[in-house]
Amino acid sequence: GNLLPILQSCYIRIYRFKNMKKNNLKIVKINENKSLFNYEKKVLIKELILDLKLGYFDFEKEAPQKVKFNLEINYEDKKPSSDKDIKSIVNYAKIVRLIKKLVKNKHYNFLETLAEDVFDELFKDKRIDKISLQIEKLEIMKDCSSVGIQISKKRSHDKL
């Protein structure tokens, strides 16, 4: 008794499938040049230590301070990196050079404004989707090995 409704339901589904018109089927072409994968890549820069002109208070403006940078830079790519083309990667050496150039002859009052300048510079590379940045002053407080900030900034894909 209970099996009959199930068998009838299966028969009806098979009958409908057999009698479908060809127009109901959609043919999809596969573009062989397009990758079926997205790569989520991350560049890591750990413990970049620089002497910077940094600080709000007068005593901080007397001499450069040791500052440590840690960065995680996320980007997506639709293809694997090429072993022959440096432009196919987000180059960590270039990022370090950019940060050094950015801070070379400039005084920052706050770590937060320094971070914004780093973000502005790095987000010029349109591949970069998200940056997590940690900046620490290493010698400013006797009771702490470091004090600092950590900020993450993500590119918005919304249209203005």
Regions found by a protein language model. Give the residues of each.
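N-terminal, polar/charged subdomain of small-to-medium soluble alpha/beta proteins
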Residues: 11-160
